[in-house]
Each structure stands twice: as C-alpha cells, then as structure tokens.
C-alpha cells in the first residue's frame, strides 16, 4: 500500500469518526457519560493521529498542493478540539446537571470568534483588513488574491493563508454538513459557476447579470436524500419487535402515524375508462374522430392536475401531528432502553422555535422533500382561498367533462361518430338562451375559469422555477472542497516563493559578476531591436501566462486554452473594473517600442514604490512585460535558447531564468555551473552570455 492509499484509508476512518462525533453533540449527556471510556479512547486515538500526521500533512500540502492532505489536517485539528470541548462540558455537566449550559458550551452559543479580520500587507507599504463571514466570501477573497499575488510578499502571503486556514477550519467544524450561517443560498456563483456559464452563449448579457441569482453547487452542494417515512416506521417496528420492546402503546403510536401519512386529501379523480378508449388509437390509425382529440386533451390536463395533487399531499397540521407523535415515540423508546427520560438537544430547546418556523428549519423525522411539498401545497391553498376562486375547481371540471364525453359515447350508436363533434363537449349547457342576464353569467364564468386556469399555471410554473432555490434553502447542504482547493494552490505558490532564499543560499550574487557597464551593454543592444511581427502574439500570450495566478490554469490542460482566457477569468472573478482590463491590455500590447517595455533602471527590477494599489499593480504588469520581452529579444539577437520560467510552476532544476515575484530576489538564473541571483534583468542576461 503506497502513501496515497494509506492516506485514503486514514481519511475514511477519520471522516467516520467525525460524522459520529458531530451526532454525539446532540445526544443527552447522561447517555454519553455511560460510554465515557469509549469516548476517551477515541479522543486519545485522534490526539495521537493529530500529533503524528498534522505537521507532515501541512508540509506535503505546501509542497505538492494536494487538497486531501489539507482537508484531512482540518478535520483532525477540529476533531481534537471538539473532543476536548465535549469532555470539558461533560465534566461540568456531572457537577451542575444543567442541560442548557452543556449544549450552549458545545455549540459556542455565548461567544463568537469566527469573524476576526484578516490582515493583508502589500509590498507597496499598504495594509488592509478584511472580515470574512462565510465560505462564499472566502472564495471571492481568494479570487482577488489570485489576481494581485505579485503585490504580496511571500512571507506575508503565508501569514494570510494561515489566517484563511484558521477561518476555514472554524467554519468547517466536524460535520460534513454546512452550517446555515456559513454559506449563501443565492450568492451569485463561484469561479466554477462562472466557468460553466462561459460554455454557453451569453445572448448579449453581461457576466454579472448572468451570475446574479445563480445557485452555487460547488462551495456547498445538495444531495437528493430519500427518506420514506412509512418504510422507516416498518423498520422501526421490526427492530422493536426483535428486541422485545414493542409494547402496546408503541404499537398504537406507530399505527397512528401510518394513518396520518396515508391520510391524503384527494381533490378529484381520474377516469380510467377514458384511458381504455384512447388505448385503441395509435399513430397508424386513420381518420381519428375529433372527439378523441378532445378526450385526449382533457385526459392530459386531468392527469396533470392529479399528478400535482399526489405530489403535494401533506398539510401543516399533518406535519405537526406526525412530529409530535414521533417525539412521544422517541421518549417511550428511550425510557424502555435506558430506564430514564432522555433529553437531547432538540428536547431541551423544543420551545425556542415556533411551529411555523419549523417548516423552514425542517425536522429530524421528516424528509426535506416533504417540507418542500408542504410549501407548494401552502402556495396553492393560499391561491384557492381567494373569494373569486372559491367555487372553481379545475380538476372537478375536467373530470366532469371527461365523464360527459364517455356517457355520450356510450349512448351513441355504432362507434360514436354519429352527430358527435368537438363542440358537443364544450359548456353548451351554460348557454340556453340569449337574454342579457344569461349572457352576462356565461361570460363571467368563462372569464373566471380563464383566470383560474392562468392562476394555476402561473403558480405551478413559479414553483417549478423556484424548485432549485427552495431545495437549496431547505435541503441538506454538504461542504464542498472548493475553498480548500483554492487555498492550497495559493499556499503552494507562496511557499515556493518563500523558499527562494534557501535555494540560492550557495549561489552567486549578480553584483559579484556584473557591473553597471554590463547592464548598459545589454540594454543598449536590446533597445535597438524589435520583436518580429510573427512573434508578437506569442509574446503577448507569454506575458499574460506570467500575470495569471495559480487558480486558473487552463493553459496547462490536456486541451489547453490560450493564457488570455485564464487572465480574463481571473479578472472577471476578482471583479476588475472594465477600464482596468483595458489598461492591462494596453500595457501588454505595447511591446514594439523600447519606451513601451523597458522601464527598470540598474538593479531596481521588481522594486515597487509606496503608491496606491492600482498603480503598484500596473508596475507589476510592466516588470513582467520587460522580463518576457528582454529574454525574447536576447534570444533573437544573440542566438541563445534561454528559457523563462515562473518559480511557482517549475522547480529550479532546469537551466533557465526564473521570475520569483519577490522584491528582494526577483531573478534567479540556473546554469550548468551555478545559480546566479539578483535584481537586474540586463545584468543577469549578460551573466548568462559570459558565465553560463
């Protein structure tokens, strides 16, 4: 078994323990005290794993960018922390026997340390504090870091990543489910939502408009969970019977709950005779009578109505009665098993939330799909309770019409074609005269039916449209690994930059090999050159590939995209203003004249002054452009094959010139003989020509 397989095994076991501990927090502490020995055993095992693996996991995620290592480190730290908190709360409960205080301690109800600001220090001597309150804000913040990463010193970047790690760890907790306060249902999407939208035509809409209201399934994601109440009650009955715990009162309660679940309010019925008649006709039948088309239409609408009714068949009263009965049954079972009345977290805080709010918070005994069905039923009920629709029932009218057609078909001779037309099945009994009062009555009822039909169709359409958002709000949301993955990519980049000092420890400083005259020699020669026309687009794309952060790397895919796509994605997700995008492209495209690309003086490459953030970022664009253009012209002029690398994407093993994005050591030249480092692009090119 290799290390990755071993990591997977440990991860699975730790996840299992984490899930069980997250459930233990809701249990009655009296029951937990009876299993104190097993609880402490698991706590010591987790402490041992944390002490043995944590530092290695952290180091491995820094050097290799493996998300699973960072995720496992988060869970291990949280497990040890929660074991300690639960054990401390148990010790206090043994003395005071206070259920409320026990649960308040476990869930940090009385204190909050989750919203401390994150401090950012830029290389232009500017500081910033940002407060992150949920996973979505962390994702947006990491997208901004991805864009302006050259403006953050490597060590400062590692400190920022450490703060984000602590914040993510606290938000994640030990449960695989996301807490409601730490994610937004409709957040405007994440960077993966943005990429998915780029695969479809925009139809002239802006990115922000298309992302508005998008339900993100990456930061947190929902799963279709099946919970069949009737089957659950049957399994519960069999378990109790097997353990000889099925008393008469429990049997009665189980039967009552099954009756509640099966007691559905039927609205109308469906006529099976119509289906039998329609079954005789297929695509090869010639001369299908008009009344068959009418019957088919009416049967379709009748079945549609019936389908809606069957789906939305639970009332608020049924839900409350069912929940109350389940609570009674739970207490009966707990008394039978433990000889005491168990008071878990839901019992202690039962009266904190009223019945109406329970519909939105859900229930431990009812599936979220049932809650969503109840919401839909409430919408339709509210619509039908309006006075104008009190006497209108779409399903009854449809079924009545279907029955009328069938009766006329039975009374008709032969196959029913004699004298039967489509008009016979319209509401002709309403129009028996042509006096004004009857005409008004007919028109009024026709109008009301039309309004009712439109009202029903609009409500059903609205429910279908909002189905995903309702599910996202009420369903169980699992934590995704998106934020951890983004953090690991940025951490790997900052870590590699922070190791430059050790990598060049035995190298040669540029000032020991070259002087100002060497700088002028290369600079003057390159200033007389210009990039050939056929290479201009390639150089521009090369510049953009050095400006992109580590999160968007489609240029390295199996079927790679050009670097300008990565840059566009980075700018859009960092919410860069349009005029700044234009300034970026103007800077990158200005490479044909020496005045457009040569900006650094002697030994000042990648030195950024104390200016505002936008100006400092523009300086970074200029330095990266100068780096790429200078290497390109140097190769063309002197016939060299010097390659340019990013230090975060390549280790300093291959021969070439590396850009580190660090102000103290921005350039590292790796040759067959030695390593040369310094802060002057032209002098280091001279060193390559004479000392490589």
UniProtKB/Swiss-Prot annotation:
Record: residues binding ATP: 634-641
Keywords: ATP-binding, Host nucleus, Late protein, Metal-binding, Nucleotide-binding, Viral genome packaging, Viral release from host cell, Zinc, Zinc-finger
Locations listed in the record: Host nucleus
Major subcellular location class: host cell
Any one GO molecular-function label of the UniProt entry: zinc ion binding
Zinc finger (C3H1-type): 190-218
UniProt keyword Secreted, yes or no: no
InterPro entries reported for this sequence: UL28/UL56
Signal peptide: none
Subunit details: Associates with TRM2 and TRM3 to form the tripartite terminase complex. Interacts with portal protein.
Family: Belongs to the herpesviridae TRM1 protein family.
HAMAP family: HSV_TRM1
Name this polypeptide is given: Tripartite terminase subunit 1
Source organism (scientific name): Elephantid herpesvirus 1 (isolate Asian elephant/Berlin/Kiba/1998)
Gene name in the database record: TRM1
């Amino acid at each position: 078994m290799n290390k990755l397989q071993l990591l997977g095994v440990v991860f699975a076991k730790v996840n299992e323990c984490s899930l069980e501990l997250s459930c233990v927090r809701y249990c009655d502490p009296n029951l937990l005290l009876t299993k104190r020995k097993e609880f402490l055993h698991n706590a010591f095992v987790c402490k041992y794993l944390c002490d043995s693996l944590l530092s290695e996991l952290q180091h491995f995620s820094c050097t290799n960018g493996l998300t699973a290592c960072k995720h496992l480190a988060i869970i291990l730290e949280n497990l040890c922390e929660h074991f300690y908190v639960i054990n401390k709360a148990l010790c206090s409960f043994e003395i005071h026997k206070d259920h409320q205080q026990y649960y308040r301690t476990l869930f940090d109800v009385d204190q909050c340390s989750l919203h401390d600001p994150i401090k950012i220090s830029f290389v232009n001597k500017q500081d910033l504090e940002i407060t992150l309150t949920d996973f979505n804000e962390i994702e947006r913040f990491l997208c901004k870091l991805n864009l302006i990463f050259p403006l953050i010193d490597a060590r400062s970047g590692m400190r920022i990543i450490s703060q984000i790690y602590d914040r993510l760890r606290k938000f994640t907790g030990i449960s695989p489910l996301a807490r409601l306060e730490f994610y937004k249902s409709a957040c405007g999407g994440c960077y993966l939502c943005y990429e998915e939208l780029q695969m479809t035509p925009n139809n002239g809409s802006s990115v922000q408009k298309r992302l508005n209201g998008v339900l993100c399934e990456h930061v947190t994601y929902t799963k279709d969970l099946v919970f069949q109440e009737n089957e659950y009650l049957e399994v519960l009955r069999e378990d109790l019977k097997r353990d000889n715990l099925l008393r008469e009162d429990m049997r009665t309660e189980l039967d009552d709950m099954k009756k509640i679940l099966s007691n559905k309010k039927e609205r109308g019925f469906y006529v099976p005779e119509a289906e039998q008649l329609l079954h005789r006709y297929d695509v090869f039948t010639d001369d299908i009578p008009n009344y068959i088309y009418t019957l088919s239409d009416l049967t379709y609408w009748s079945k549609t109505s019936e389908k809606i009714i069957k789906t939305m068949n639970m009332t608020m009263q049924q839900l409350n009665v069912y929940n109350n009965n389940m609570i009674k049954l739970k207490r009966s079972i707990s008394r039978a098993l433990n000889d005491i009345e168990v008071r878990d977290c839901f019992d202690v805080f039962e009266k904190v939330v009223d019945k109406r709010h329970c519909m939105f918070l859900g229930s431990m005994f009812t599936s979220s799909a049932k809650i969503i069905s109840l919401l839909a039923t409430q919408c339709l009920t509210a619509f039908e309770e309006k006075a104008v629709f009190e006497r209108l029932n779409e399903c009854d009218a449809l079924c009545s019409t279907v029955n009328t057609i069938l009766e006329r078909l039975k009374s008709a001779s032969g196959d029913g074609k004699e004298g039967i037309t489509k008009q016979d099945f319209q509401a002709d009994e309403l129009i028996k005269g042509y006096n004004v009062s009857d005409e008004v009555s007919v028109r009024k009822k026709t109008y009301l039916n039309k309004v009712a039909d439109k009202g029903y169709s609009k409500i059903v359409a609205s429910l279908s449209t909002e189905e995903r958002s309702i599910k996202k709000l009420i369903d169980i949301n699992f934590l995704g690994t998106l934020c951890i993955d983004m953090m690991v990519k940025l951490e790997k980049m900052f870590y590699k930059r922070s190791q430059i000092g050790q990598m060049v420890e035995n190298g040669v400083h540029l000032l020991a090999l070259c002087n100002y005259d060497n700088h002028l020699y290369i600079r003057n020669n390159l200033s007389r050159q210009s990039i050939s026309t056929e290479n201009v687009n390639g150089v521009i794309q090369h510049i953009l590939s050095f400006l992109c952060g580590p999160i968007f790397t489609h240029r390295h895919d199996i079927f790679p995209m050009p670097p300008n796509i990565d840059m566009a994605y980075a700018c859009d997700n960092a919410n860069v203003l349009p005029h700044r995008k234009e300034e970026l492209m103007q800077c990158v495209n200005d490479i044909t004249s020496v005045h457009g690309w040569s900006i650094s003086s002697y030994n000042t490459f990648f030195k950024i002054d104390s200016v505002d953030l936008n100006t400092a970022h523009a300086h970074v664009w200029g330095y990266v452009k100068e780096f790429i253009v200078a290497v390109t012209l140097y190769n063309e002029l002197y016939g060299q094959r010097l390659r340019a690398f990013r230090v975060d994407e390549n280790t300093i093993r291959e021969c070439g010139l590396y850009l580190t994005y660090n102000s103290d050591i921005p350039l590292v030249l790796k040759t067959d003989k030695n390593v040369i480092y310094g802060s002057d692009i032209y002098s280091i090119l001279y060193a390559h020509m004479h000392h490589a």
